[in-house]
């Protein structure tokens, strides 16, 4: 991926969850874990877990369009998501 696709629609949606575009970019520019993908409305969608520069743990739903990441939604990881994220990080370090 070569960048991000932002517009008022997705910026306003993630803002309702208290997340900024900068935080999402920090996660993807860091070391995110990719959880799974699924198809909705004929489009492959993905979910990623990651940590911002300030240590905020986020779950991000996104699509890939024209080599760009387009965030659909994002929220603070739930306890369950955090356990999955931590387990994946430990497994990768082995």
List each language-model region with its residue ranges:
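Ribonuclease/tRNase effector modules and their secretory precursors
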Residues: 1-94
């Amino acid at each position: 991926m070569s960048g991000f696709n932002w517009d008022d629609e997705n910026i306003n949606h993630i803002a309702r969850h208290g997340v900024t575009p900068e935080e999402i970019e920090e996660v993807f520019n860091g070391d995110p874990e990719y959880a799974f993908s699924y198809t909705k409305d004929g489009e492959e969608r993905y979910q990623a877990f990651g940590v911002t520069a300030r240590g905020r743990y986020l779950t991000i739903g996104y699509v890939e369009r024209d080599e760009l990441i387009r965030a659909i939604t994002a929220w603070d990881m739930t306890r369950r998501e955090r356990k999955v994220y931590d387990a994946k990080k430990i497994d990768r370090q082995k």
